[in-house]
UniProtKB/Swiss-Prot annotation:
Biased composition (Basic residues): 60-83, 164-175
Protein family (similarity comment): Belongs to the eukaryotic ribosomal protein eL19 family.
Gene3D superfamilies membership: 1.10.1200.240, 1.10.1650.10
GO cellular component: cytosol; cytosolic large ribosomal subunit; cytosolic ribosome; extracellular region; nucleolus; plasmodesma
Organism for this UniProt entry: Arabidopsis thaliana (Mouse-ear cress)
HAMAP family: Ribosomal_eL19
Protein known as: Large ribosomal subunit protein eL19x
Sequence segments annotated as region (Disordered): 60-85, 144-214
Biased composition (Low complexity): 189-207
UniProt keyword list: Ribonucleoprotein, Ribosomal protein
One Pfam family recorded for the sequence: Ribosomal_L19e_C
GO biological process, one term: translation
Length: 214
């Protein structure tokens, strides 16, 4: 039998496919063996002596069906698992996923002014310290912290208002006490004693002069 390796290689080059896709008509092997140029191969392709095989179709319907079932949790029992738990899903990957979710939530809350930069830093360090196991716990902690801060602020405002009220009451009492002391025991304002006039000296009697003896 005549070798048709050259013709198959040229046909694959002309039809731009692999050599496995080339079909040579076995009844026309004598004519095909005479073709030793690309031009002759093109003529044989045009005549139908050389054909490009159709692409085989591999159905993925079963694969899609299995994927949907696995998404529901089917076919994932102990008998279907190969590899340790760490090999199937490393704890580091779980950690990175959780950190990214929680940090993304904190960044979103900070940008929307739901938390200030101080609470952001505090919660960020708690996330790093593995305090929150999921996003729901972090959100609950943020709401609880905000409510506690609002409560502390309300109590502080009430305390300051009470202090101001007590201070005003003390000032009023002090003013009334000063006023009572100024009025005196009789209830009326005590008269201010006028300064006594200066005493005038009494007139002295004239002493008679003695006559001198001459």
């Amino acid at each position: 039998m005549v070798s048709l390796k050259l013709q198959k290689r040229l046909a694959a080059s002309v039809m731009k496919c692999g050599k496995g896709k080339v079909w040579l008509d076995p009844n026309e092997s004598s004519d095909i063996s005479m073709a030793n140029s690309r031009q002759n191969i093109r003529k044989l392709v045009k005549d139908g002596f050389i054909i490009r095989k159709p692409t085989k179709i591999h159905s993925r319907s079963r694969a899609r069906k299995m994927k949907i079932a696995k998404m529901k949790g089917r076919h994932s029992g102990y008998g279907k698992r190969k590899g340790t738990r760490e090999a199937r899903l490393p704890t580091k990957v779980l950690w990175m996923r959780r950190m990214r979710v929680l940090r993304r939530l904190l960044k979103k809350y900070r940008e929307t002014k739901k938390i200030d930069k101080h609470m952001y830093h505090d919660m960020y360090m708690r996330v790093k310290g593995n305090v929150f196991k999921n996003k729901r716990v972090l959100m609950e902690s943020i709401h609880k912290s905000k409510a506690e801060k609002a409560r502390e602020k309300t109590l502080s405002d009430q305390f300051e208002a009470k202090r101001a009220k007590n201070k005003a009451s003390r000032e009023r009492k002090h003013a009334r006490r000063e006023e009572r002391l100024a009025k005196g025991p009789g209830g009326d304002v005590a008269p201010v004693a006028a300064p006594a006039p200066a005493a005038t000296p009494a007139p002295t009697a004239a002493v008679p002069k003695k006559k001198s003896k001459k």
